Amino acid sequence: MSAKTIIQITDRGDPRIAPFIGVRERDLTGGADGRFIVEGKVPLSILLTQSRFEVDSLFLCETRLAPLASLLKDVPKGVPIYTAPQSLMDEIAGFPIHRGILACARKGSQMDLSAILSGQRILVLNQLSNHDNVGAAFRNAAAFGVDGIIVDSQSCDPLYRKAIRVSSGASLWLPFHHGGRGEDHVSALKAEGFAVWAMTPRTDAAALYAQPVPDKLAIVLGAEGPGLPDGLIAAAHPVRIPMSPGFDSVNVATAGAIALAHVFSAEH
């Protein structure tokens, strides 16, 4: 720990910890300054060891320094580690940071869509505005071997603090492209030879378990409630998950997990 830059914070107005002031308000800005916040031990570990993102600084409750000593060895040289008592940290952040662990990182350049299209298994998120659902979708994608994720411009940022936490840090290392329209994504995927499954509860859609798994496959998930736009479904291959009579849908992240598990089990 002696080789690391440990800085004790005693004043909530200290400009050095500006990125951590009012974390929830920062969430609302969507990281307009090109930085984002990571919360918790597991996401921090991934940020330091597996992520493609550059770490700016850490802000830890002083009681967390010793328990995190082995992990903090992975903090890049020159990255400051700010520390404060729990009460001051909570005051600075604007709410109780029960885990006592925050980090600030830089988004860097957007990953190009062509990099995602080089994979074989792609997940596409269309108009998912719920951070929990986006985070869970990333976690499921990581669990079932997805190569990359395409997130349309109307979906929430996968680097939103809560989305990162719910993803168990998967959004920090799993390749993704954020932007554009779902219909355009489907066209780009088909042009690259992908079969595109549009997950929908429509009764005229093909049953998931009857589908052979193609070599190149993209699975598209839409928002709960409205689902996928009709035009997007028409441009893809509509697929439904068979369910008990009288029930036609599950949570979007659950639907994604079921579809991805079907594909994964067919290959393993």
List where the protein language model places each region.
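Boundary-proximal intrinsically disordered activation/regulatory segments immediately upstream
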Residues: 1-67, 155-157
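Amphipathic alpha-helical repeat scaffolds
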Residues: 40, 129-137, 250-255
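Short beta->alpha connector loops at strand-helix junctions that form conserved
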Residues: 84-85, 126, 152-153, 175, ...
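Short, aromatic/basic amphipathic alpha-helical patches
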Residues: 66-78, 231-232
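Active-site/ligand-binding-proximal alpha/beta "capping" segment
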Residues: 197-247
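Structured adenosyl-cofactor binding patch, chiefly the S-adenosyl-L-methionine
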Residues: 100-103, 140-144, 158-171, 230-268
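Short acidic-hydrophobic, aromatic-tinged amphipathic segments that line or gate anion-handling sites
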Residues: 7-11, 80-85, 174-182
